[in-house]
């Protein structure tokens, strides 16, 4: 498993810079997408020098950059794979609406990358969950989800149905587990093509 260790620019004091997935994602068609961030302080994390550095490696080819940062001026935000859980195989975005996840911005993403979307409300203590990846994550064969955080039973049934169609094993998380970020799981692949779940 290859890990890229990138240093932050100390003078910028970006305390959340260890979450680059909120400002950039990379896709199989060699597209990179840059996202509109809600917190003005976090917008400094977006760095073209990082994209140029990654392009030096054979495993990273960037042929197209889709920059959605312009949506920030209209108050529309979409914080990468924090806001969205991507089913990259079936081109479906799962997203719970929040102050950091605007439907307008999500629609722009879906149109530009040819995804369909499943939008729902998810809460903890009656407050919207700020990022979808807190309560859900997808691997090729697994789906971690905190169903009890989803307000509408119809949404739960629809999401579970989609997981079933894609033959993913559903792993249910409790609210307590979600609060401890048990839903924030990544699937990575090593050089032998073997998948691993990390958290």
Predicted features and spans:
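The feature marks the mature, well-folded catalytic cores of soluble enzymes
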Residues: 1-199
């Amino acid at each position: 498993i290859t890990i890229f260790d990138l240093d932050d620019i100390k003078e910028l004091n970006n305390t959340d810079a260890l979450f680059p997935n909120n400002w950039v994602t990379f896709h199989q068609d060699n597209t990179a997408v840059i996202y509109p961030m809600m917190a003005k302080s976090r917008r400094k994390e977006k760095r073209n020098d990082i994209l140029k550095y990654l392009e030096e490696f054979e495993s990273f080819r960037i042929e197209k950059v889709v920059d959605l940062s312009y949506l920030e001026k209209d108050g529309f935000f979409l914080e990468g794979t924090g806001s969205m859980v991507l089913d990259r195989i079936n081109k479906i975005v799962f997203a719970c609406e929040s102050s950091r996840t605007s439907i307008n911005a999500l629609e722009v993403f879906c149109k530009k990358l040819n995804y369909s979307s499943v939008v729902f409300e998810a809460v903890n203590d009656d407050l919207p969950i700020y990022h979808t990846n807190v309560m859900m994550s997808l691997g090729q064969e697994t789906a971690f989800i905190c169903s009890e955080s989803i307000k509408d039973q119809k949404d739960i049934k629809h999401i579970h149905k989609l997981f079933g169609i894609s033959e993913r094993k559903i792993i249910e998380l409790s609210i307590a587990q979600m609060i401890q970020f048990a839903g924030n799981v990544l699937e990575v692949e090593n050089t032998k093509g073997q998948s691993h779940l990390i958290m």
